[in-house]
Each structure stands twice: as C-alpha cells, then as structure tokens.
Amino acid sequence: MAATTSKIDDSMPARISSDCPEEIREVLYYAWGHDRSGLKKLLKTTGKATAQDPKTGETPLHAAIRACGPASPDDDGQEEDGSVEEAKDIVHDLFLQGAIWNDVDSNNETPGCLALRLGRKSLYQLCIEAGVRAELLFALMGDYEELSSGSEDGDEEMEVQQDDDEEAPQLVSTEDVEPTVEEPKFIPPDAKEKQVTSEEYLNSKLVYDDAKLVDSDLNGVMMAWETDIMRRSVAALIPDSAPGKRILNIGFGMGIVDGMFAELKPSRHHIIEAHPSVLEHLSKDESKFGPSWEKSGPEEGAFKVHKGKWQDIVPKLLEDGEIYDAIYFDTFGEDYSQLRYFFSECIIGIMDQEGKFSFFNGLGADRKICYDVYTKVVEMQCADAGLDVEWEESDVDMSGLEKAGEGEWEGVRRRYWTLDSKSFEGAAVLRYAVGTSNRL
C-alpha cells in the first residue's frame, strides 16, 4: 500500500541521502534536475536507470516525478507546467533504458504512486503504460520459457571436453584473492512480508466465523464485506435473474456467491473447491451445500461439489462435455498467471457461446497503480483469448475498511483491499470483468 501524504518530506535532501554512493547520487541529481542530455550520457552505463539510493530507495523515476512538486488544486490536467513536460521526457528515457515501473521507495511508493499523490496525471499515465508493457512482456517471456523448457527434440547442449594431456589450471590461494565489498542496497519496507502460495494455503488450517474465513497465518481468504461485490457480479453474469442457468463457481470459500446463485434456481450448479477445511465444512449436515443439496438437484450430478484443484477438475468437466452459462472464478493463493491460464486455455471448452465469465478482481488491490495496470492487462489478454470484456465498476463502502487490524480487518494479518475513495477521486471502486465469447 502506498504511504499517506501527511508525513512525507519530498525535498531533495530528504530523498537523496548524504552518504548515497556518488555514481547513484549523480544519476538522481540529473533526473531531479530534468537534465535530459546529461542523463542520457549516464544511461549509457547499464543499471543506471534502475539505481536506488540505499537508504531512501529513491530511483531516477521517483526523482524526476518528485521534482515537479504537487499539482495546483485547480489544475485540471489539461495544461501542465513546464516542469511536467520536462519530466515526461525524462520518464520516457528512463523507461526506454529499463527503469522498473513498480520499484518502491522508503515511503512504500512506486513512481506511479508518487505521481498519483502529487496529482501529476500525465506522469501517472506514463507509469501505467510502462507497467502494462512490462507485464505483457513478462507474460510473453513466460510463454516462451514454457514452450522451450524440457524439450528433448531440440538442439543438444554443447559439451566441453578437456584433453587428457591438457595442463590443469593452477590452484589459486584464497589469500591472494581480495574480498569484494558489496555496495549497500535498498531494502523495501515490505521485504519481509510473507507471500501466500497455493501449496501453503492448501496445507493450512482455516477458521470460519460469521464475518470472515482466515488461514493459519491470519490471511483473509474471504470476508463478509465482499457480499455486495459478489451480488453485483451475479447480477452481471445473469442480468435477468433467469432460472435454469448452468453455473460453475471455482472457489467456494464462505459460500457467499454460491448462495446467490442457488437463489436463482439453476438447472446445473457445480462448485470446485480444493481446500480440506472448506470441504470438511461443506460435508456437514447443516451445510447448505452438503450432501442433501447435491441430492436435491433436478437430476443426478446437476448439483455437485467437485473436490480438488480446478487445474485437475476442469479437464474432466471438459471430457464430460459440461457447458456453463455463467462461470465465476475466485481462488486464493494463486497468482495472475493461473487466472490467465484459466480464461485463455479453459474457458473456450466449457462456456456456452452466449455464456459469461467473471472473477473477483483483487489484482493489485492494495495499490491503485497495480490495479490500473492489471485492468488493462486482463482486458488485452482476454481479447487474445477470444473474450469480449466489459468492465463494470462497483462502489465499495470503505467504512470499517480504513485501517489495518481494525473494523472489518480485526483478526486479519493484512488488508488485501486498500483503495480508498481518494484513489478514484470519488467513491472507492472495484472493477469486475464480464467476459463473453467472440468466437464463432
């Protein structure tokens, strides 16, 4: 989450530390001064665009943006002052030389977070565009690595052999080697924050109460405050509330969205859930989606909880010829690559031509720049997968969600939604995608 504005000193002495290494200080000064010609000379050296003050984490991107200062309250963003125009050139050059769009400083702000806080909309937009380019490139590189790794039919690796009569290299005494002194490096504020993986999540013990579902590390898996968001998602998936729809939900959690789907009297309602604690909860007699619910379907197998990972279950549904009118995706502990794999590789085989797909969009929801970047990335990659995407926005009532450890977040380790109303210049907004097939 980006820092608040009240305690941040944006002056140059505060951001470029007195003991910052000379070669880093130099590039920061040039970026701060918007000296394009001088900076270009420095950027010829590899790594200069990504340099960071080891104490403050200031990067050349931060420096170029911070030097503009805050925008005037009556600035509508249509006419920007000369310093912003100069900064745009510097930011462009830095991104061209490999500057990282989401590096954070000691305030836990990315360059985009800083531009947003200062009200510099055009600079913020440049950061979004750079983030989108970077994420799309990483996705392409990941696809390439997946295709090329483990190939047994490709070129064999070249083996280097040493002739028996070749003289062996002499051993070098460790006393003759001068130890290298590592330059101090900036440590991000959240460097020690534990990241949740799917494997760790599935092996953890979950605890239910009326307001939330948390894992053994107190990560919020699902919370009651999401109810209104899910209600809007259901309305978008089935806008006429028509009965008889074929529904697939991936990730049961607290059963919020499944309860809403059930009220619409679907003809088929399938749930995929992998976590043992959730499955145990579902198996109880008092569960609304337990054995008695499965038996209440219009035909055998119409209402069913599929136990296991969706990566294993979906191929079986495809083999069985299952087709759905509405598909909702809300897993936990998985990164974006898994969501992308689902809508790129799986949707086409199990969704009706007139069907709709949606997911809980918490991608980067603890930082607006990340949220905006992933909104564009998802839209572009859904289009590549043959899905027409329409984003709908839902106001989020932030009462009780403002502070970590308080209100709705009491008993939860970290807030996974932190975008307040200031982030959107109005009510807090959650975007959710509704994808429909554009394939003939």
UniProtKB/Swiss-Prot annotation:
It comes from the Eukaryota. S-adenosyl-L-methionine binds at Y201, M230, F252, G253, M254, G255, I256, V257, E273, A274, H275, W310, Q311, D330. The keyword Nucleus applies. Its EC number is 2.1.1.-. InterPro entries: Ankyrin_rpt-contain_sf, Arginine_N-MeTrfase_2, RMT2/GAMT_Mtase, RMT2_dom, SAM-dependent_MTases_sf. The keyword Cytoplasm applies. Residues 152-168 have a biased composition (Acidic residues). Residues 192-440 form the RMT2 domain. S-adenosyl-L-methionine-dependent protein-arginine N-methyltransferase that methylates the delta-nitrogen atom of arginine residues to form N5-methylarginine (type IV) in target proteins. Monomethylates ribosomal protein L12. Keywords: Cytoplasm, Methyltransferase, Nucleus, S-adenosyl-L-methionine, Transferase. GO terms for biological process: methylation. Monomer. GO terms for molecular function: protein arginine N5-methyltransferase activity. This is Protein arginine N-methyltransferase 2. It is found in: Cytoplasm; Nucleus.
